Amino acid sequence: MGIQSSTMKLPLIHEISDYWHLLKPKIMYLVVLTGVTGIIIAPGNIHPLIAVISTLCIALGSGAAGAINMWYDSDIDALMTRTKTRPIPAGKISRSSALEVGLVLSFISVTIMMIAVNYISGILLAISIGFYIYVYTMYLKRRTPQNIVIGGAAGALPPIIGWTSVTGSISIESLVLFLIIFMWTPPHFWALSLLNYHEYEKAKIPMLPVTHGIFTTKIHILVYSILLFPITLLPGLFLKDPVLYEITAIPLGLMFVVQAFQVFKSSISYHYRVMFTYSIIYLFILFTCIMLSSF
């Protein structure tokens, strides 16, 4: 009896895992981190329950966008080694089910955010989801190498959403956090595109290395990384502990530029991978430090 029970549970566990991966959890983690940062550093008070609700809505909104993105991109995901094991191309979840999950989570997250938190946060969450789906996924991704640059605005909105959850308004401080993520996104994804250049080419996705070549992509990575550095110093102007922040942000940012320079002068994929991995660690540490420096 016990063996039968365990056997019956396994398919359910696998199904839950498949739907979880449909929501792009790795992206969700960073989205939640940046959203929570906005909540924590915003002036004023917020009830802990409202803060939790806002965070959950941001997470659900991110997952909703991820699910609909996988629904729309299932054809090209099936062509690339990096993405062909995703739930839809792997045959674990149907396209219709993925779309239903995405639409339901979009509605739930935006509605709850509007009712339980405030209208502006709900509207911004809806804009973030809509921009990622309609502007980036459905329009830009398959048409222009600037897909990541423009589309990055969707992923840069969570700290503003977190901020408005507390204050009910957008401020310069929240826009600085937006700008950091906006400038971080291109070099992060261009490093990934260098690693998967041939796969993007096979899937006919006009990533920068495919349309303009590897050398041009390296120049763009270096330029954006250099421009990102002074922008990341701006939070020191409004955080309560600017010294703690700057002594962390400066070496972090310099290392980011160093990694970008390594990518520029190297043709070894190892450096592309290091840049991609470091960029994730970089954003995690930077926003954690922003939160800690606000106390």
UniProtKB/Swiss-Prot annotation:
It is an enzyme of class 2 (transferase). It is a multi-pass membrane protein. CDD domains: PT_UbiA_Cox10. Pathway: Porphyrin-containing compound metabolism; heme O biosynthesis; heme O from protoheme: step 1/1. It catalyses: heme b + (2E,6E)-farnesyl diphosphate + H2O = Fe(II)-heme o + diphosphate. It holds the Pfam family UbiA. One of its GO terms (biological process) is heme O biosynthetic process. GO terms for molecular function: protoheme IX farnesyltransferase activity. GO terms for cellular component: plasma membrane. Keywords: Cell inner membrane, Cell membrane, Heme biosynthesis, Membrane, Transferase, Transmembrane, Transmembrane helix. The keyword Transmembrane helix applies. InterPro entries: Protohaem_IX_farnesylTrfase (IPR006369), UbiA_prenyltransferase (IPR000537), UbiA_prenylTrfase_CS (IPR030470), UbiA_sf (IPR044878). The keyword Ion transport does not apply. Its EC number is 2.5.1.141. It is found in: Cell inner membrane. The chain crosses the membrane at residues 30-50, 51-71, 93-115, 119-136, 148-168, 175-195, 219-239, 244-264, 275-295. HAMAP family: CyoE_CtaB. PANTHER family: 4-HYDROXYBENZOATE SOLANESYLTRANSFERASE (PTHR43448:SF7), PROTOHEME IX FARNESYLTRANSFERASE, MITOCHONDRIAL (PTHR43448). Carbon 2 of the heme B porphyrin ring is defined according to the Fischer nomenclature. Converts heme B (protoheme IX) to heme O by substitution of the vinyl group on carbon 2 of heme B porphyrin ring with a hydroxyethyl farnesyl side group. Belongs to the UbiA prenyltransferase family. Protoheme IX farnesyltransferase subfamily. This is Protoheme IX farnesyltransferase.
